[in-house]
């Protein structure tokens, strides 16, 4: 790995970061001169994706995207506009477009910037960016090694849906007329594989993946490929089970989907629209008393870590569920005002939910403890 290459990558991102900061500052300045409050978010991202299928390179993709999103407030009238052109003239035209839109919108008592005292003026460095010296050849090698490991694992693996390696880096900048201007760099790397197994003319498929901010923290290509094959083979020879009452364990990927329904039900948008099954449940028992969820937005280097939300509100540790009791709603500034409450820093979503286990063992230990029951590996359909 070339240290010079990594330095150049980082220097380029830092240059883009400064360009975005300048663009955000200019947009806010133009809006303020027109008598409006403003918030501006800027992003710049680039990446490489290489996929293989049946031991041959199938696709190589490069991406390079950037945008500036501008929201202005004339009193409580709001206008939005965006541009991918960061020239001063384009920024001026975009702000003017947002102002023109705002003049034709109806006033909304809940519209406006998030409260100034909630801003992340002192946003911490969460170590979200790790440069990697990765090119097409190395990315293809990783994908091919992954797929080969899966195909060679067992003769029942008869086909492949492919393997892929993805590398992504980006810059995020946010500013508003409260004087907030913060930014950070980020990276994300992933390696995945999906294969097909056959037994007595019955086909099954499954997959495996690894993802991290740091390429050196990814699981090996061998691990991803063999796990994809092993999970696929485990699906062969399915059997019907008799109707019965039994304990149930959800695999972590499936459980994440279930927990996302909880997050949606306690989000401010669902609550003020009265589209939630947990209306008026704050402080009430919603889950078993052994169930706990906490949110940790500032964990170093984690995928869902962020120092501030998409409104610039400082993120903070929260207890979401404690002993089965709902401790907080998930609010933006708008939904908070609709409900007569304060933003909780959730514009843009949730950040690192940690489910505290009620058992010290991992899956194998849980299965031994269950003795006989149902392990749910996949669900179909929508809703809960």
Question: What does each model-found stretch correspond to?
Answer:
Residues 2-29, 35-49, 93-183, 217-256, ...:
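Acidic low-complexity segments
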Residues 5-47, 266-297, 349-372:
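Short, compositionally biased leader-like segments
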Residues 48-103:
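N-terminal alpha-helical targeting/anchoring segments
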Residues 48-64, 166-194, 324:
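Conserved alpha/beta core surface patches that mediate binding of polyanionic ligands
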Residues 61-74, 182-210, 320-322:
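Short beta-strand elements
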Residues 83-85, 208-209, 332:
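Residue-level structural signal for beta-strand termini and adjacent loop
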Residues 123, 279-384:
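Dual-mode signal for accessory low-complexity, basic/Gly-rich regions
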């Amino acid at each position: 790995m070339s240290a010079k290459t990594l330095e150049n990558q980082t220097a380029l991102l830092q240059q883009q970061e400064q360009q975005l900061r300048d663009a955000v500052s200019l947009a806010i300045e133009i809006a303020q001169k027109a008598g409006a409050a403003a918030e501006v978010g800027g992003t710049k991202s680039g990446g490489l994706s290489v996929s293989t299928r049946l031991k041959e390179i199938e696709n190589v993709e490069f991406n390079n995207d950037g945008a500036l999103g501008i929201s202005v407030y004339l009193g409580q009238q709001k206008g939005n506009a965006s541009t991918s052109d960061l020239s001063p003239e384009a920024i001026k035209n975009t702000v003017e477009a947002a102002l023109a839109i705002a003049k034709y919108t109806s006033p909304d008592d809940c519209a406006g910037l998030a409260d100034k005292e909630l801003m992340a003026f002192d946003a911490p460095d969460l170590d979200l960016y790790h440069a990697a010296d990765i090119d097409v050849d190395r990315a293809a090698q990783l994908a091919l090694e992954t797929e080969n490991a899966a195909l060679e694992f067992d003769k029942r693996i008869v086909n492949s849906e492919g393997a892929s390696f993805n590398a992504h880096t980006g810059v995020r900048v946010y500013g508003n007329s409260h004087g907030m201007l913060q930014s950070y760099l980020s990276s994300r790397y992933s390696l995945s594989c999906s294969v097909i197994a056959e037994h007595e003319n019955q086909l099954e498929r499954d997959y495996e993946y690894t993802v991290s901010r740091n390429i050196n923290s990814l699981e090996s290509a061998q691990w991803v490929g063999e796990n994809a094959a092993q999970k696929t083979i485990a699906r062969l020879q399915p059997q019907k089970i008799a109707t019965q009452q039994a304990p149930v364990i959800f695999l972590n990927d499936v459980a994440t989907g279930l927990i996302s329904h909880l997050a949606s039900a306690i989000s401010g948008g669902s609550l003020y629209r009265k589209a939630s099954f947990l209306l008026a449940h704050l402080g009430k028992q919603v889950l078993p008393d052994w169930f706990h969820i906490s949110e940790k937005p500032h964990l170093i280097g984690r995928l869902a870590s962020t120092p501030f939300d998409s409104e610039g509100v400082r993120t903070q540790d929260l207890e979401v569920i404690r002993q089965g009791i709902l401790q907080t709603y998930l609010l933006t500034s708008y939904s908070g005002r609709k409900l007569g409450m304060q933003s909780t820093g959730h514009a843009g979503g949730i950040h690192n939910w940690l489910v505290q286990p009620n058992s010290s063992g991992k899956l194998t230990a849980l299965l031994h403890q269950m003795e006989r029951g149902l392990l749910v590996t996949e669900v179909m359909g929508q809703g809960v």
